[in-house]
């Protein structure tokens, strides 16, 4: 199989696996209706939490991270490191822009973490540690997510993995674009804090994040 065919296979497989909308599937199975009709309309764990089911939100978080990690691991094992990187990146794209749901999905933080943990675990651990540290200091979930994503390409470069740094950098750009409403509220000082109450303005935005969980 040529390099181009390997890349195409990894991209297609990663995208299709990443596009499985676990948040939507789980909430429908639980009789909670269409998760896209509440909150931000996203399919990630953050919005699932708005149903009041912390167990489903936690399971969604694990599955969303896991699907990207599994895609990267499977293609990386059978087709090589580059294929693993491509599969992980496209699993991220599939989660954020699933074809089955009109290309409206989650914000990609969980799938980003899952991908990083598999393609190069030191970077994945750096992302998790950065999120935890920023969340503990500033108590703002979206800020922690943005800082964690930004840390990834620099960590990859520090560890001598420019290939991972390039992929992480591209995904970080997408994460920032998907969090543009959050960034706007951060600049205005209106982003809610973890454990705090939302104002009416920030509570009803179309793509906001719950302050009690990482944006996913």
Curated annotation (Swiss-Prot):
Organism encoding this protein: Maricaulis maris (strain MCS10)
Keywords, alphabetical: Cell inner membrane, Cell membrane, Lipid biosynthesis, Lipid metabolism, Membrane, Phospholipid biosynthesis, Phospholipid metabolism, Transferase, Transmembrane, Transmembrane helix
Entry-linked SMART domains: G3P_acyltransf
A single GO BP: phospholipid biosynthetic process
InterPro entries, alphabetized: G3P_acylTferase_PlsY
Gene coding for it: plsY
Catalytic function, reaction form: an acyl phosphate + sn-glycerol 3-phosphate = a 1-acyl-sn-glycero-3-phosphate + phosphate
Name of the protein: Glycerol-3-phosphate acyltransferase
Superkingdom of source: Bacteria
Compositionally biased spans, kind Basic and acidic residues: 192-201
Keyword Cytoplasm attached: no
Oligomeric form and interacting partners: Probably interacts with PlsX.
Enzyme Commission number(s): 2.3.1.275
Membrane topology: Multi-pass membrane protein
Region feature (Disordered): 192-216
HAMAP family given in the database record: PlsY
Entry's Gene Ontology cellular component terms: plasma membrane
GO molecular function, one term: acyl-phosphate glycerol-3-phosphate acyltransferase activity
């Amino acid at each position: 199989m040529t390099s181009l065919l390997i890349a195409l296979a990894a991209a297609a497989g990663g995208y299709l696996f990443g596009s499985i909308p676990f948040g939507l599937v789980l909430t429908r199975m639980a009789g909670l209706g269409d998760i896209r009709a509440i909150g931000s309309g996203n399919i990630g764990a953050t919005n699932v939490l708005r149903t009041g089911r912390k167990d489903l939100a936690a399971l969604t978080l694990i599955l969303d991270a896991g699907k990207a990690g599994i895609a990267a691991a499977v293609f990386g094992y059978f087709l090589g490191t580059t294929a693993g990187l491509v599969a992980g990146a496209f699993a991220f794209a599939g989660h954020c822009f699933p074809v089955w749901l009109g290309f409206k999905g989650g914000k990609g933080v969980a799938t980003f973490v899952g991908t990083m943990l598999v393609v190069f675990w030191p970077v994945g651990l750096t992302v998790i540690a950065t999120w935890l540290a920023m969340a503990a200091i500033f108590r703002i979930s979206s800020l922690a997510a943005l800082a964690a994503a930004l840390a990834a390409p620099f960590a990859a470069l520090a560890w001598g993995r420019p290939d991972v740094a390039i992929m992480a950098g591209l995904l970080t750009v997408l994460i920032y674009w998907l969090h543009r409403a959050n960034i706007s509220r951060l600049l205005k000082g209106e982003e809610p804090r973890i454990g705090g109450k939302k104002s009416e303005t920030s509570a009803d935005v179309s793509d906001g994040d719950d302050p009690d969980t990482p944006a996913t």
